[in-house]
Amino acid sequence: MMIINNQIHYPVLLKEVIENLITTKDGIYLDLTIGFGGHSYNIIKILDQKARLIGFDQDLKAIAHCNQLFSEFNNVSLINDNFVNLKKHLQLMQIDNIDGCLIDLGVSSYQLDQADRGFSYHSLGRLDMRMDQNKAVDATKLIQNSTVSELVKIMKNYGEIKDPYRVVVALKKAFEKKELNTLEVVELIKKHVNKAELYANKHPARRYFQALRIAVNNELEVLEKLLSYLPSYLNKGGKIAIITFHSLEEKIVKKVFRHLASISSLNNLPINNELLKKYHNHFNKGLSPTQSELETNRRSRSAKLFVLEKINN
């Protein structure tokens, strides 16, 4: 638990992350979405002084907060950048291998609670949704600059919405007249979705906001690019722990982890012999929060933890 701006924030699946990530107390660990430091602060307290923790975040406010939070530790480095640029930074730091890497793919509680960031469909603010505030295109500009067909594709691919056409047309018409704020967008969505979506258990705007956020931040593309090379940096026994929050992230992580867990360390051919495998996929279906955590932190309800371990060089 952490207090940020008088709000209580809980690192999701913290116990499970610590149990599955830390393999050696004097190793090199990465937190590629350090956010406001909830996971990493608990991790660094367990590690030895010889260990090293490197945290990435594209949100400058998160890095500023972490600079204060970790000021007592001289073995923590913080980098304000998207994790898609990890390889460049590891080369600059002359790091060839790591012992563990955490990636929490969720929007931080702090970002959701800041109405002006535009991530929440419960709060009044500009429809922004940029993780990196220096990016030129936010969600408002994305709607303004995209065609109806482009927006329909975004909603289908990133929101998994079967028929977003009516909502998209209404959005385009509305934004041609003026910029709508988050709550105005929510009302527009409610007005144009079908009754099944309107009265479903989950908020009717949830998938539309998700689709816009993913598109604005290129979330799936950067995740796929990262996972194409990240596992090769692991030392033997090292682990990658990824927390997903929706099925699109989950599909990417599952596909990569399952593929790597089927490859032989000898010749990169598929093999069933566990002794010859290069990687081990710990949780095929992902590890979900306990009932106790769900009762304490509602935002953890869709979280799943996936862990890949390098078992042979």
From Swiss-Prot:
Main location per UniProt? cytoplasm
Which keywords appear in this protein's UniProt record, sorted alphabetically? Cytoplasm, Methyltransferase, rRNA processing, S-adenosyl-L-methionine, Transferase
Look up the record and give one Gene Ontology term from the biological process aspect.
rRNA base methylation
Compartments it resides in: Cytoplasm
> Where does this protein hold S-adenosyl-L-methionine?
37-39, 57, 83, 104, 111
Q: Which residues form a coiled coil?
A: none
Give GO MF terms, alphabetically: rRNA (cytosine-N4-)-methyltransferase activity
Primary role: Specifically methylates the N4 position of cytidine in position 1402 (C1402) of 16S rRNA.
* UniProt-recorded name of the protein: Ribosomal RNA small subunit methyltransferase H
Origin species: Mycoplasmoides gallisepticum (strain R(low / passage 15 / clone 2)) (Mycoplasma gallisepticum)
